[in-house]
């Protein structure tokens, strides 16, 4: 899978997160809702369901060689499958080297997400030195880390919005439960008073 190519998937991904959070909140009992601050419940629910933003570990890599190419396999922490999605800020941009058939010296990066690695390959032309490849690798790391920072920003925004939304929803539910309980208590008091007459 080529990095940062899915322009629509991130919205679906975020909808999936929201669906899981909503299911978690719907499963709360009245006692849980009344017994805990809404912001605390919201924070715990969102944290439990949010995706872990990917980060590169550019110093943790292996090298391989095939005819005409040098391959770096770089360790990724977090959910590396998120690297498929275009961050909001990058919607109109294409990362350097992220082309199906790169020219000489350019990188072609692919995700090997089940194992938490990204593979980036550099074409080797006549006269290419180790310094040339390392320079391209550092440039690729820099650009990829910039895109990942945008993706992390998208995830942080989503998390903040979800916490705010759920806190408001739980506050409304707490108020509704308390109103219903007060109404019930009034009716129960009237019933008891009628029984004493």
Each predicted region: which residue ranges?
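N-terminal "first-domain core" detector
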Residues: 1-64
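Short, Lys/Arg-enriched charge-dense amphipathic segments
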Residues: 54-75, 174, 178-188
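Acidic-enriched, low-complexity/disordered segments with a strong bias for Aspartate over Glutamate
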Residues: 6, 11, 31, 49, ...
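Mixed-charge (acidic/basic) macromolecular-recognition segments
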Residues: 114-197
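Intrinsically disordered, low-complexity regulatory segments enriched in Ser/Thr/Pro
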Residues: 63-150
């Amino acid at each position: 899978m080529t990095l940062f190519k899915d322009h629509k998937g991130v919205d679906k991904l975020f909808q999936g997160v929201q669906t899981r959070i909503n299911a978690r909140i719907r499963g709360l009992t009245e006692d849980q809702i009344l017994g805990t601050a809404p912001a605390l419940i919201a924070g715990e629910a969102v944290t439990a369901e949010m995706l872990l933003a990917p980060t590169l570990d550019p110093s943790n890599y292996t090298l391989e060689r095939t005819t005409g190419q040098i391959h770096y396999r770089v360790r990724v922490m977090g959910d590396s499958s998120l690297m498929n999605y275009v961050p909001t800020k990058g919607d109109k941009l294409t990362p350097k080297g992220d082309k199906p058939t790169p020219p000489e010296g350019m990188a072609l990066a692919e995700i090997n997400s089940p194992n938490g690695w990204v593979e980036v390959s550099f074409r080797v032309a006549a006269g290419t030195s180790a310094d040339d490849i390392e320079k391209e690798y550092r440039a690729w790391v820099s650009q990829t880390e910039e895109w990942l920072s945008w993706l992390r920003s998208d995830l942080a925004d989503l998390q903040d919005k979800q916490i705010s939304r759920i806190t408001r929803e739980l506050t409304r539910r707490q108020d509704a439960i308390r109103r219903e309980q007060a109404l019930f208590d009034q009716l129960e008091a009237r019933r008891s008073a009628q029984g004493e007459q």
